[in-house]
Regions:
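Active-site-proximal helix/loop segments of hydrolytic enzymes
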Residues: 3-6, 37-245
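N-terminal pre-catalytic segment of deacetylase/amide-hydrolase enzymes
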Residues: 1-14
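Short glycine-rich His-centered loop
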Residues: 11-36
Length: 245
């Protein structure tokens, strides 16, 4: 879905992908109060907040979703009961690449949250280092990681940095094809029929918090935390497009 700028137009389009959704709730976390939280809900809220900020700054914004739904138009073999199969999960991410390309986006931003053991914490930003625009990927990833981490820690939250990393270390090996591919489908290159239509613009994917850490999960689930992340993401995007940057 596309949203026109509400501020003076800058004639730039940003594609925001709220990770997961619909049959795929993403990671399941918890807050300090014991409330169960779902990654797909949190990414959507951050996406929508970021959209409003960017539109006011003059950007045209295209988003992967505006509610709890898949991006993919579901087909045979995509669901098992009410959840995605491995095929469905893969097809859903491919659909996000298609959306970004059809939007003629100048920049792609993946919004996700991390998960792991309860002791795992910190922010990480991934980029793809083998695309023709790898230098721009890295430049934006550094801005995104720096600005989001600085905004959170300016409030005394003490979020560790997991740094800016190549997407070759961040993908999930859902099957042998995913393992052989070795990249995030949202950011990575073409790979036969597995990724026939990769994204065609620079981009990065951020996971600002571990929602399986109750402290970080509480931040991710709070409106204040979501707004802080959104403002910092919008700042990084604005810096990326700054003249002479």
């Amino acid at each position: 879905m596309a949203f026109a700028p509400t501020g003076a137009p800058r004639h730039l389009t940003v594609f925001l992908d709220a990770g997961h959704g619909g049959p795929d709730p993403g990671a399941v976390g918890t807050t300090e109060s014991g409330r169960t939280i779902y990654e797909a809900d949190l990414t959507l809220r951050v996406e929508l907040d970021t959209t409003a900020i960017l539109r006011a700054a003059g950007f045209r914004v295209v988003v992967s979703r505006t509610r709890d739904t898949s991006v993919l138009r579901l087909g045979p073999g995509d669901l098992s009961g009410r959840v995605f199969t491995v095929q469905g999960s893969h097809h859903d991410v491919l659909a996000r690449d298609v959306c970004a390309n059809e939007a003629h986006a100048n920049l792609l931003v993946g919004i996700y949250f991390d998960a792991g053991a309860p002791s795992y914490a910190g922010a990480v930003t991934g980029y793809d280092a083998v695309r023709p625009f790898a230098r721009e990927n890295l430049r934006f990833a550094k801005l995104l990681q720096t600005d989001v981490l600085a905004a959170m820690n300016a409030l005394g939250w003490g979020i560790p940095s997991e740094g800016v990393q190549s997407d070759t270390g961040l993908g999930s090996a859902l099957n042998s094809q995913a393992l052989a591919y070795g990249h995030l489908v949202l950011l990575g290159p073409a790979y036969g029929d597995y990724v026939a239509t990769p994204s065609r613009m620079p981009g990065a994917l951020i996971e600002p918090l571990f929602i399986t850490d109750p402290f970080e999960g509480s931040i991710a689930a709070s409106r204040h935390g979501q707004e802080v992340i959104a403002r910092a993401m919008a700042k990084a995007i604005d810096q990326y497009f700054a003249p002479g940057a």
